[in-house]
Amino acid sequence: MNLTDKTVLITGGASGIGYAAVQAFLGQQANVVVADIDEAQGEAMVRKENNDRLHFVQTDITDEAACQHAVESAVHTFGGLDVLINNAGIEIVAPIHEMELSDWNKVLQVNLTGMFLMSKHALKHMLAAGKGNIINTCSVGGLVAWPDIPAYNASKGGVLQLTKSMAVDYAKHQIRVNCVCPGIIDTPLNEKSFLENNEGTLEEIKKEKAKVNPLLRLGKPEEIANVMLFLASDLSSYMTGSAITADGGYTAQ
């Protein structure tokens, strides 16, 4: 896949899809920098992986200075930045008439503004290099509306359009920008949400959730990481502004 010695910066890389991406890119001999708000989890990940190609920087992506520092840390540690994966995201379950403004703002700040801030500072280095690759984690919620998470859906719709806008604006600089739209993935974040917002055991809830798509199962984090590998590699060299759906057939129904 020609990813050896490429430097990849992944936000939200300490767990779930992000951590699967970390492992996938390390497996391709890439250098990986993880920017995550959870310092304890990030440091535990570094100890577990025990790989000189992995670096962690504690980052709140709603803070522009922190985003700039994360990008500069990647450049300083490994000598450049080839791929940015904007993966960090949150979800708050609440219908519009019950949602607090602070919760609405929090979801948009993390899921959309954080992506803008990370991209802004990564693009400066990519423009100087004359090439680059940005991969955004969107969601099926950016294509169709999941019930009871309007702020999340709105933020992911914004991610889809931000992806296309950046793709159009930076194609002439040989910077590709694409996104992946996962369906329901078996992650710690989703497990927490399942238990907080549904009746029954975790196993029972997962079985019910799996029924919504034709493959009749939840997705695995590594299955989304594999899409990211493809988008980061030369195998997708003619793709920019694209949204790859990996949802077990949910949106095909």
Swiss-Prot record:
NAD(+) binds at residues 9-31. The active site is at 152 (proton acceptor). One of its GO terms (biological process) is antibiotic biosynthetic process. It catalyses: L-dihydroanticapsin + NAD(+) = L-anticapsin + NADH + H(+). Pathway: Antibiotic biosynthesis; bacilysin biosynthesis. Its EC number is 1.1.1.385. Disruption phenotype: Cells lacking this gene show an accumulation of dihydroanticapsin and dihydrobacilysin. PANTHER family: DEHYDROGENASES, SHORT CHAIN (PTHR24321), ESTRADIOL 17-BETA-DEHYDROGENASE 8-RELATED (PTHR24321:SF8). This is Dihydroanticapsin 7-dehydrogenase. It comes from Bacillus subtilis (strain 168).
